[in-house]
């Protein structure tokens, strides 16, 4: 199916991670010119660029640092699409009464501030009809006990930030769009080793499909939302990629 993404200039932040690399591969498969962002995963980004070949480039930046984000967009040049995938899930399970302010701030920086700076940089350089895709989480919809910091950041992305951006972007370009995906439990390097089989069985009770997503499941929806052909009249929307999740298991019995 034609997506209209051939030749489009695409930036994928967090491109060396699980969902990010899947997005980069999916855009490259559609003939897009992909720039893969990384922070600490240079080796993975270089390997991915070599795998994709063609016009694929890489760029390193700490997305919580304003100057580095500005440099990233200066290096990227004109862009048509930005997939703001980069984020961080803190592995340690902490209720709010044990949550240090330092972790709270670090989690909001890595997720919400990084997404804000990425969105701002993309909109500043936008010319013509572009597409911005934010990546939230089901934690931002139904919460996540033990990770209130992460849930708060993702909720802000999927709520106030998304809905504000979709109305602001059209001031730059009348047909430009902003949408978001909300992955549920997804197999990725960020979660691998931190989630037990028992935890997966427990949370899958809330899912119609009762399985963990793969990064390519999320990437497929990112491509659909980026496509001016498939989603040209879609903006301000959140697509849940969570196997029909309806909430959280609050009590074991």
Predicted features by range, described:
Residues 16-17:
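Conserved glycine-rich cofactor-binding loop
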Residues 172, 177, 233-235:
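Short, small/polar-rich loop/turn modules that mediate ligand/substrate recognition or access, typified
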Residues 137:
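Residue(s) in the substrate-gating loop at a strand-loop-helix junction
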Residues 229-230, 235-253:
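Short C-terminal tail/terminal secondary-structure segment
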Residues 119, 153-154:
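Active-site helix of classical SDR
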Residues 207-218:
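A conserved structural motif in NAD(P)-dependent oxidoreductases
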Residues 92-96, 100-105, 203:
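Substrate-binding pocket helix/loop in short-chain dehydrogenase/reductase
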């Amino acid at each position: 199916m034609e997506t209209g993404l051939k030749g489009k200039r695409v930036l994928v932040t967090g491109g060396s991670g699980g969902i990010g690399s899947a997005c980069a591969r999916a855009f490259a498969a559609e003939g897009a010119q992909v720039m893969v962002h990384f922070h600490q995963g240079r080796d993975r980004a270089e390997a991915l660029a070599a795998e994709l070949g063609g016009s694929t480039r890489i760029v390193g930046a700490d997305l919580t640092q304003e100057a580095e984000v500005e440099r990233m967009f200066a290096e990227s040049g004109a862009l048509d699409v930005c997939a703001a995938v980069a984020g961080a899930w803190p592995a340690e399970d902490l209720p709010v009464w044990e949550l240090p302010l330092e972790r709270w701030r670090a989690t909001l920086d890595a997720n919400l501030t990084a997404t804000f700076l990425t969105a701002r940089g993309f909109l500043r350089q936008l010319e013509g009809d572009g597409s911005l895709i934010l990546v939230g989480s089901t934690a931002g919809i139904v919460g996540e006990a033990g990770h209130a910091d992460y849930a708060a950041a993702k909720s802000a992305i999927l709520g106030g930030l998304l809905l504000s951006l979709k109305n602001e972007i059209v001031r730059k370009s009348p047909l430009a769009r902003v949408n978001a995906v909300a992955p549920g439990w997804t197999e990725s390097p960020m979660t691998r080793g931190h989630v037990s089989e028992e935890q997966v069985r427990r949370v899958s009770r809330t899912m119609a499909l009762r399985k963990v997503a793969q990064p390519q499941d999320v990437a497929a929806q990112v491509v659909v939302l980026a496509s001016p052909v498939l989603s040209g009249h879609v903006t301000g929307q959140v697509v849940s990629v969570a196997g029909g999740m309806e909430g959280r298991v609050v009590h074991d019995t």
